[in-house]
Every structure is written in structure tokens, then in C-alpha cells.
Amino acid sequence: MNKYLAEAFGTFWLVLGGCGSAVLAAGFPDVGIGLLGVALAFGLTVLTMAFAIGHISGCHLNPAVTVGLWAGGRFDTKDVAPYIIAQVIGGLIAGGILYVIATGQAGFDVVGSGFAANGYGEHSPGQYSMLAALVSEIVMTMMFLIVIMGATDKRAPQGFAPIAIGLCLTLIHLISIPVTNTSVNPARSTAVAMYVGDWAVSQLWLFWVAPIVGGVLGAVIYKNLLGKESND
């Protein structure tokens, strides 16, 4: 049970820290943290939680990571569904707290602001198409899993995995925030989409399908190509 609670708490922190920075701080007058700050915030949530709960649950915080690690032979089948449920619950609680905080500002419009929801077409920050969003999310999540698999490989330098994984997530956000607002995490997308409703819910399917496909691809590529012992 501890590992499921850890995943819920960890995903809670990822959503509150990452989406919270986007909603509350990104465009704050004069001292807003901007795109770079939001990207760094997401990376820092994973970095801090990896040290806090990595030894308890592995610090997945993401259904695409859980399914990817399972596909890569690094995770037990019986824990896949409970992990995903815990991640979604933790994210939704964080989304609710963020909603309460954000709507405490006079005139705040959840739907109009986007509430850090992920989207494509007219709801993409840069007006990118559904195809562009699909490709971006698949490729970014694929690379995320390759980094996770490599950084946690027993042959990798020990103790540096949280840093590599956190920085990778920061880089992913720097690349793809303009395209989809960056998901690579179905729990993160669900956590805010449920409070926006409307278009965010109707487009949510892409932010489940693409990250999971990308996660499986990345894990399988690492397991079968990059992760094999070399005879050279």
C-alpha cells in the first residue's frame, strides 16, 4: 500500500508544482517565470520526488512511465493498474487544490485561461495540428523512457538518475510547450482537463494514447537495442 500512496503523493506534487507554476506564476505581471520557469518546475517536481519516494515506489508519477517500464520488463504486471489509479487520483486532488487557489483571484476564468490543459489545433499554444501534437507527444515520451531506462540501468553511474530524469523532463517541456503545452503524462493531463471540461476533455484521448504509445516504444527500443550488453 505504501508504494501506491507514494505514487499518489508524488503525482500530486508533480501536478501542483508543474501545472501550478504554469497557472499561477508563468504570466504574473513583471516577475512571471515564463516558459523556462514552467519547464524547470516540472523537472524539479520529478527530481525532488525521485529522492523522496524513489526508494518506495520507483517514482513513476505517470501512467506512460508505468506502462513503458512494464513493456521494458522492469515492472510487475499486477502493479500496473493500481499505480495508474493512484497517479490519476493524486493528480486530480492536486488539480482541485489548484482550482481553489486559482479561482480565488478576481476575474479568473478557468476555461478561458486554459488552466494548463493540453490541447491541439486552436487549443495548442502555437496552433499546432492534431498530427503535430500526436507526433510530438509520442516522440517526447519515447525519449523520456529511453532516458529513464538508461539512467536506472544497473550499469549506469549510481545516484544520478533523478538528476538525468528531471533534466530530461525540463528539456522535453522546453521543446514541446508551444506544441501541446506538454503532456507526456496522461495523469497530468487528466488532472487539469477535468476542471476545464469542454474542449480539454474532448481532446484528452490524445494525451492518453500518444504518451503510452511513446512510452512503450522507448522502453522496447532501450531493452532490445540500446540496453543489450556489448561484446565490443
UniProtKB/Swiss-Prot annotation:
Residues forming coiled coils: none
Motif NPA 2, residue numbers: 185-187
Domain of life: Bacteria
A GO cellular-component term linked to this record: plasma membrane
Site residues (Selectivity filter), renumbered to this chain: 42, 173, 182, 188
Record's bilayer topology term: Multi-pass membrane protein
Transmembrane segments: 8-28, 33-53, 84-104, 130-150, 159-179, 201-221
UniProt motif NPA 1: location: 62-64
Swiss-Prot/TrEMBL site (Involved in tetramerization or stability of the tetramer) positions: 19
Location in the cell: Cell inner membrane
Pfam families given in the database record: MIP
InterPro entries reported in the protein's UniProt record: Aquaporin-like, Aquaporin_transptr, Aquaporin_Z, MIP, MIP_CS
Record text on subunit structure and interactions: Homotetramer.
Note on domains (UniProt): Aquaporins contain two tandem repeats each containing three membrane-spanning domains and a pore-forming loop with the signature motif Asn-Pro-Ala (NPA).
Name the UniProt record assigns to this protein: Aquaporin Z
Organism: Vibrio parahaemolyticus serotype O3:K6 (strain RIMD 2210633)
Gene behind this protein: aqpZ
